[in-house]
Design a protein with these regions (language model features):
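Alpha-helical transmembrane segments and their membrane-interface boundaries
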Residues: 1-105, 112-155
Length: 155
């Protein structure tokens, strides 16, 4: 498991080096990819596959909500609060109740990154989605390997 998390971290770091947006954001983005590995990886291939698609969907929805907020609403604590509630409600309505926290996490990290880096919300959202995809892919591959090699998550 440690190897998978490190693979996600280094892959996330390297992808951020290809598109150098901001040094701090790049490092946090690598950590975001590593954390995503932990979310997606399961001992069984089928469970990892389900987790992969749910994670990608939640990340994309969270990104879209974040971009809409950043482009069209005032940047204020009282402007963000209803958006968080909206994201949680949307996750319930769409049947992603177990991924609502992930949607909100994605929303918040994009808002935070948009305050650190003055790039377009689209760039920040795109990079965060790419980091999630990388981490999710590593977790998915780990699930396939983990099914063949029991005890992978013991390391």
């Amino acid at each position: 498991m440690t190897g998978l998390v490190l693979a996600g971290y280094f892959a996330g770091y390297e992808i951020n080096q290809l598109v150098p947006v901001h040094a701090t954001v790049n490092l946090i983005g690598a950590l975001w990819a590593a954390a995503t590995v932990l979310t997606v990886y399961k001992d069984q291939r089928v469970e990892s596959q389900k987790s992969f698609f749910a994670t990608i969907t939640a990340a994309l929805l969270g990104s879209l909500i974040a971009v809409a907020y950043l482009l069209w609403l005032p940047q204020h604590v009282w402007g963000l609060a209803p958006i968080i509630v909206l994201a949680m409600l949307l996750s319930q309505v769409l049947g992603f109740a177990d991924r609502g926290r992930q949607m909100v996490s994605m929303l918040l990290i994009i808002v935070i990154f948009s305050h650190i880096s003055k790039n377009s919300p689209w760039v920040n959202a795109g990079m965060r989605d790419l980091e999630v995809f990388i981490g999710a892919l590593v977790g998915l591959i780990g699930g396939y390997v983990g099914e063949q090699l029991p005890g992978l998550d013991d390391t």
